[in-house]
Amino acid sequence: MIWLLVAHFTAAALAPALVRKWGRQAFFALALVPASAAIWALPRAPGVIAGEPELFFLPWAPNYQLALAFRMDALSLVMLLLAAGIGALILLYCARYFSDDEPGLGRFAGVLTGFAGAMIGLVLANDLIQLYLYWELTTVFSYLLIGHYPERRDSRRAAAMAINVTTMGGLTMLVGLVILGESAGTYLISGILAEPPSGTAVTVALVLILVGALSKSAIFPFSLWLPAAMQAPTPVSAYLHAAAMVKAGVYLIARLTPAFGDIPAWQYTAVILGTATMIGSGWRALRQHDLKLLLAHGTVSQLGFLTAIFGIGTRDAALAGLAMLCAHALFKAPLFLVVGIIDHSTGTRDLRELSGLRKKMPVVFWTSVVALMSMAGLPPMAGFAAKEAAFGAFEHADTLLATLALAGVVVGTLFTVGYSLRFLWGAFFDKENTSPTPLLHPPGPLFVAPAIVLAALSLLGGFGASLADPVFASYADTVPGAGHDPAHLALWHGLSLPLLLTALCLAGGLLLFRWRVMVAWLGARFALPEAGNVYRRIVYYLSSFATQVTGLTQRGSLPLYLGTILVSLLVVSTAPIVWGRLWTLDVPPVRWIDTPPQLIPAAIIIIAALWTLIVRGRLFAVVLVGMTGYGTATLFALHGAPDLALTQFLVETVSLVVFVLVLRRLPPQFSTPVLRSRRLVNLAIGIGSGILVAVMAYLTLAGRQAESISEGFPAAAEEAGGSNIVSVLLVDVRSWDTMGEISVLAAVAAGVASLLFVRRRTRLPHTHIETGRIVARLPQPPSNGESEWSPLPLTYVGDIITPRVAHKPLWLPGVLTLAQERRSIIFEVVARLMFPVIILISVFLLLTGHSHVGGGFAGGIVAGLGLMVRYLAGGRHELYLSLRLPPGLLIGLGLSITTGTALAGAIFGTEIFAGGAFDLHLPFLEPIHLTSALAFDFGVYVLVIGLIQDILYSLGAGIDEQAEKDSRTGKAPEYESEEVTA
Amino acid sequence: MIPLSLSETTLPTVTTQAPDLDYWLLSPLLVVFAAGVIGVIVEAFVPAQRRYSIQTALAMVAVGVAFVLTLVQVGALPADSAGLTLAFATVVVDRPSLFFQGVILALALASLLLIAERRDGESAFTGQAAAVPGSEEERAHVLAGSQHTEVYPLVMFAVLGMQLFTAANDFLTMFIALEVMSLPLYLLCGLARRRRLFSQEAALKYFLLGAFSSAFFLFGIAMVYGYAGAVEFAAVRAAGSSGGLIDGGEPLLLIGIAMIGVGMLFKVGTVPFHNWKPDVYQGAPTPITALMASGTLVAAFGAMLRVFYVAFGTTVAQWRPMLWVVAILTMVVAAVIAVTQRDIKRLLAYSSVVHAGFILTAVVAANADGLTGAMFYLAAYGFTTVGAFAIVTLVRNPDNGAEAGDLTQWAGLGRTSPFLAASLGLFLLAFAGIPLTSGFIGKFAVFEAAVAAGATPLVVVGVLSSAVTAFFYVRIIVLMFFAEPAENAPRVLKPGILTGTTVGLGVAATLLLGILPGPVLEHVIPQPAAETSEAVAAEHTAADSLFAR
């Protein structure tokens, strides 16, 4: 069986080449492929009907129980013959329908052949996932076929609508299939049918599968796509939308009916929706002018009929359903083909323009009459036999549902008779006020032949109904509850209720035809909303909803993104706290306050933080943020942690200065004012997050099991020869950590500088004082052979300034380069006087760090602040002058000293970082307690100075220089970045 | 250090013995790490014009060697045990980790091909990241043909982080891996050659939000430590079944799970932590986007599976509701938003978000099928997405050579460049989960696992969301094949050998995994040794029997 599929898909792949070579005649060759499938099946039919299905099994993905499993039983056989037989005829028809120069014909031929293959696979598949696979393949192929005229907007739309509706249904069905397979423990359809699982999950699965089936078979509420799909070339309509693809849904229902036909949800859904579709679409068909649309609505109506029949779920219904399915394929396909012939020959298919074709195309006319009689359910056609059986099945089912459904399908059949007559009259008969339609070119024999064959089969089917009965019964008997009086297909059942109903339908149909104008008017007057419009509106609303959601959530605003994350975090973290009553845990008691003065910095912090949210100036905001830092430092101090406080103070100061240096180049105010409401929301989120983190930090204490490590710190500090625990921790107990941290600091310094100095920094800017003038000469960077450009910062040569008062000593020599209005004598004097003091303090902090407040880090920052003061007072050249060592050297030196100390411990002592201590006694001073840790701390000290110098060089002097250059070249300082504040 | 002779009770003993490392088992990590370090040294000492060839060769050889070593190790794993733990049980070598590492290395190699691609000496990266966008200086650099070959060592470090992320066996190692992975990526995101401000903004956003999520991750670790008294996965797992260290401490675990979850879900990019994804994917240089969309996603899910299956494997009931909500939100919101996208990279970003939601359904399943399903899905998605981004790099604006992101420009591409459009069409079909592509098997695998675990509603949502996403994938295919070529039709570059290989790899993987998934499922993806699906409990042990602890 796998070879059938391989043959089809190979033929599909070859089709474009064949069409290129032979033109439309290639369809003859392609028609052989489905024909051979039908021929393959015929000899196997007796065995299959006798109850010995053909099987094929090949594992595909055994881990997921996926397999290439095929099985041909009676139902599959019938479907295969329909799909392959009609497929072959349609391909023949194509050979005359198209012309050689039809654009995209090669692709069309390939896709159509491929579709036939997919359809054959679909009806043979014995694995749920295989079934789904072919199901989706038919969807995709049908999409390509409907969209055959890509240049037509309607064609594209119809194709998109069809694929959207059926894919959605298909995917829903996939869920159902997976649930079904999981509940049954196997994905083999035969296995599931043999031992049907049950339970709520299975019911859900069946409803989901039904959604897929109904969408494929265009049952209400999914009927909209089929009429729209009539944009496709007529052979496609005849094959996909009458004989094959739309039957897939009905096939699936038929396939599962033997196992699940008695489940109420399944029954009610199928019967009610099926009947409703039959009536609704039949009514719509009655007012169509386009013959093809008339047939399309008629097809939807008939599909509803089929669904309703199978939905009844009895053995007789299954028999009638399968018979009706065959009859429908045999009459609807030729009718579509006839429409194609008419369209082709006259150039129109609008029944208001057609007239008098009965005499001009007699063969076509009689073919249509036969097919229409079958459609209307008139004897002696196949349609009659099938419909009689169907009425009988409804009658015998003997439930309220079936009885109501019977009434419904009688109304539907009545409409069917009506629109059959409308078709016949509209296509062929003479009409008043309409001149006979001229034939552009009469249809050739080969063009008409497929329709004749199919119509003839409709006729034969009627007479041979009793011959076909065993085939259909072979399937129908698999439905349980046959009873002792199973129905049989026959042309003549005797005078019974079905026959009576047929007469009623005929009479009603004639009346409808008689009053066709009024019916059309009534239909149009009281039409339900056009399904297509509903679909378009849904799509429109979906996309506008999506746009709104996108606009709301995806506006590119960082605060908004962060807010979303924080809110989610608040929700997911608060829930367990509240739910688990975490506050009932055994946590240490809260100490709200130690001394009243703590309230002052606390209040300052809160006010400053809130104020920060309101201000518009950047600088002010930075100052306010700094105040929260100073407040925290004060709290540290009040809490008895002078080291922390000192470090915090110093760090705050440095950051404040750095901020100010950077803000010089930014607009003074935040660029966009923030909405008050947004600020309030942000405020709430901020407060919420803060409280959450605080609460969690506090509650975590409840989880403490081990003794705190800090219990041992005093002893450790003693051991290390110091009395300042913080300092000892930094430079001794955890010196490895400090090593890591200062390495990071060094890397950060390099990073900050490299952002401004694009090029590798070559040498220290060379500033020195010669007699009478300051020479500030910046070295030329090494010339780069590749480019001729000059990088901005460090190339400017010059700044040779002759001072006005050369012989007077200056407080700060660097100020000579400053403009007069920028100078401040007082500041210069203070800076000059303070500098040695500051350096002295820094050294003091460094030396005493081990036993008192201070340390290398704090000392380094203090020294850095000294540099900072000189820079602020004297400008960048003063900075260059005040410390002649380049920052890179200092940083490297600092790192070397610390590493050296560490290694020295290994060389002279016992291990890395091993150390010693001794007291140095100097005159006039307290004995200085020297330890090897001091050397380590000195490294930190040097490194921190280098870091601050680096920041000043880059963010201070570097930016100054750019600004100077800009002002020289007359360029106004431009703001390079816009801050996102919203 | 001055020896501390304190009593044992007050200070925990610090080991004095160096750990005994099995360098052979660590070799895939070490090779990539070494390549990164050597790359840095190359930057410092090799003349600029020779760096490109050395760096590309170094990076590709390293990734290739690491890949081979990973494969060899799979073969060398003892058949009867799940795997081994190394270096004080901080790193684990088991079948899932080796699988994820192998996939990551393969995807990294594919991305490296894109990264290394140069056209007329132009790579996807800016010549000089520090030059102000639009400045004279930038122009000078462009004219001089400057290039950042630092990209390669950065990528190596990122890949190292990804490898380690899937192999970490305790939360702290995992955190370090997270940072090693993320930091280079933050930087790489800001290096786009064109639309640089955009790229820098993306990098900044990614960095800030990523920093926050890392912080949450750390907070979560602290909470879990408070609950379990340990950060090792095995210990956390044991604590989960014994009820933790303290009475009533379960909320600590819950907060821990939530916060660790937030950290990981951010990396994975699920709603509501997805916001960064479209902006970053769009702004970053496309080869880096490809690396992030494939490698990072695989790594993040690899880690997530390990955390939730092993560490939190005994507390499934506690975290399942959260992941349910996140999965549903992700699949619905991202699918809805994706419909409106007009830019190919943003669309792929949202598609990545939706796919993350699909994979989450497998995590929620918490059974062996979920694990193998997620593995297959990740591998399939990774290759497809790398291929898709490779194609994005080829379609350029005619005037300035930037990538033509606007989808309207892609109209009619099927006529002008049929192979390219067909490849993208295939990738899109795979994203949509159409049968015979890898995407279908992947979706089937995760959905099947979720149904088996009783998460049917999740699967229903997932499938509906697939339908919505299929809508926009199909729309692009329609646009490419059925619409008239656009006025401002893009210039389609002829794929060079590097990009061509990546596209080819994507197509081959998508088709192979779609048509012949059997061999892959059987031989490549680790399977639990004995599937005992008798009881739910038994299933749980089967689920994590794959993981070494």
UniProtKB/Swiss-Prot annotation, chain B:
Topology term for the membrane: Multi-pass membrane protein
The reaction(s) this protein catalyses: a quinone + NADH + 5 H(+)(in) = a quinol + NAD(+) + 4 H(+)(out)
One GO cellular component, as annotated: plasma membrane
Keywords: Cell membrane, Membrane, NAD, Quinone, Translocase, Transmembrane, Transmembrane helix, Transport
Leading EC class: translocase
GO molecular-function terms, A-Z: NADH dehydrogenase (ubiquinone) activity; NADH:ubiquinone reductase (non-electrogenic) activity; quinone binding
Methyltransferase among keywords: no
Compartments, record wording: Cell membrane
Pfam families: Proton_antipo_M
Major location (coarse): membrane
GO BP term, example: ATP synthesis coupled electron transport
Ribonucleoprotein among keywords: no
Annotated signal peptide: none
Membrane spanning stretches: 26-46, 57-77, 96-116, 148-168, 171-191, 206-226, 253-273, 297-317, 321-341, 347-367, 375-395, 421-441, 466-486, 496-516
EC assignment: 7.1.1.-
Entry-linked HAMAP family: NDH1_NuoN_1 (MF_00445)
Function of the protein: NDH-1 shuttles electrons from NADH, via FMN and iron-sulfur (Fe-S) centers, to quinones in the respiratory chain. The immediate electron acceptor for the enzyme in this species is believed to be a menaquinone. Couples the redox reaction to proton translocation (for every two electrons transferred, four hydrogen ions are translocated across the cytoplasmic membrane), and thus conserves the redox energy in a proton gradient.
Subunit structure: NDH-1 is composed of 14 different subunits. Subunits NuoA, H, J, K, L, M, N constitute the membrane sector of the complex.
Family to which this protein belongs: Belongs to the complex I subunit 2 family.
Protein name, as recorded: NADH-quinone oxidoreductase subunit N
Species the sequence originates in: Thermobifida fusca (strain YX)
Taxonomic lineage of the native organism: Bacteria, Bacillati, Actinomycetota, Actinomycetes, Streptosporangiales
